[in-house]
Amino acid sequence: MGVIQGPVRVRFAPSPTGYLHIGGVRTALFNWLFARHYGGQFILRIEDTDEKRYVPGSADDLMASLRWVGIEWDEGPDIGGPHAPYVQSLRYEAGIYRPFVEQLLESGHAYLSFTTEEELERMRAEAQARGVKAFRFRGPERDWPLDRQREMAATGRPYTVRLKTPTEGVTAFRDLVRGGERIEFKNEELYDIVLVKSSGMPVYHLAHLVDDHLMRMTHVLRSDEWVASTPYHVLLYQAFGWDPPAFAHLPPILRQDGRGKLSKRTDDVAANRFWERGYLPDAMFNYLALQGWSYDGYTEIMSREELIERFTLDRVQPSPARWNPEKLLDMNGIYIRRLTTEQLVDAMAPFLARAGLIGNPPTPDERAYLLQLAPLIHERLKELGEAPELLEFFFRDVTDYDPQALIPKKMDASTTVAALQAARDRLASLEPWTHDRLEAELRALGEELGLKPGQLFGALRVAATGRTVAPPLFDTLAALGKPRTLRRLEAAISVLAAAHAEVKGQS
């Protein structure tokens, strides 16, 4: 890309029609990185002109999702700015779009169309019956004088405002993601799109373009699904006599199997779902930056500062990116392991509180205990949301032992009960209760009993935690403390002895 003249201004303009799709976060991120790389401004604008699909509260949700990832805006609905308001419905109510509609009508670049939806459906069906592959509507009113159009409107007949597209020649633009390649559309293959609905509300094609011009956008970075609409936008810029911004259409993100794009309807791709599951903002930021962009083909872990410094559009690939949840999970694990113990405790505390294991916020004693527990799972953790399940037995008693899980390989119930009783007796007098003393005593006990470490330690692990997989045994016992460890050994011995007695009684 050539040298950029003047301050860069870009925007992310989502529609509040539900949760924010992770692909939308990627689009916002690319805009944000582009603005920050060139020292420009990133603007957030809410495009809520589709009344039928509007979902109350979704604008707040999408702003929260962006802020969670670490994307802040320089101007926007909640912080204002020199071009406020930044919500299209409010701009419509303020009458911002009306003079531009009049300008298009007066210049002959738009017209009032009185064709109803029912008539359009009939025309489509008739065209299909004739074997027409693509129905391209051009209303008869496009050739009427404006006075005649206004006279018809004065009778009360509903109408829309449509763009009067040319029927000859081509409309073209250059795309920065494709190296400035010139993309052409034959005008004869266009149709007269609606600019203003019968309700008077401008549609996306008109509203976003007027807003981009008034807000002085220099570049438009958006999904490549808008490539087919761009010739209409170019025609509108020409009709107004405005210079268009530079266009950059970003590659889609495909499902992991490559079969189609990520979809709100069929894929678990709500940005807030990753927040809820315990993905770190820095990990998500880093991973999304690599969805369609690459620095050198192999460097993947990059800080925000490095991404800002390195991000340019000539490194955005026009070919589709592919979503890889396993790679994202691994990257999240890398970022979790980079946290200090204190940072990990702060990060996982809300998840433990939500599970009812600690208070919100944690008490000083709870926080001190978490500082002891966090190192036990730090290396294993890939989602913060896993922390409650991994740590639950430290906060709640084990109540449902599986007798079979208590019995190690090549041992039976009787020998396991004897081993656990011996461990209980040895540990009852152990002081101090530390990792090193626990390890020394239990290893010595195992040798005395003629057991392999895996046998004794396996039985002790299940007795202490109720699980076959848990953090390192001696760290776990040290963190549980002596009284709780001894109580759990007693409980496990009782469960296993009772199960053994029942089996003997049946034989």
UniProtKB/Swiss-Prot annotation:
GO molecular function: ATP binding; glutamate-tRNA ligase activity; tRNA binding; zinc ion binding
Alphabetized UniProt keyword annotations: Aminoacyl-tRNA synthetase, ATP-binding, Cytoplasm, Ligase, Nucleotide-binding, Protein biosynthesis
A biological process term (GO) from this entry: glutamyl-tRNA aminoacylation
UniProt motif 'HIGH' region: location: 14-24
Binding residues annotated for ATP, in chain numbering: 264
GO cellular component: cytosol
Predominant subcellular localization, coarse grouping: cytoplasm
Protein's cellular compartments: Cytoplasm
Motif ('KMSKS' region): 261-265
Reactions accelerated catalytically: tRNA(Glu) + L-glutamate + ATP = L-glutamyl-tRNA(Glu) + AMP + diphosphate
EC number assigned by the record: 6.1.1.17
Keyword Disulfide bond: no
Keyword Nucleotide-binding: yes
SUPFAM superfamilies reported in the protein's UniProt record: An anticodon-binding domain of class I aminoacyl-tRNA synthetases, Nucleotidylyl transferase
Family: Belongs to the class-I aminoacyl-tRNA synthetase family. Glutamate--tRNA ligase type 1 subfamily.
Assembly with partners or alone: Monomer.
Protein's job: Catalyzes the attachment of glutamate to tRNA(Glu) in a two-step reaction: glutamate is first activated by ATP to form Glu-AMP and then transferred to the acceptor end of tRNA(Glu).
Protein name, per record: Glutamate--tRNA ligase
Organism of provenance: Roseiflexus castenholzii (strain DSM 13941 / HLO8)
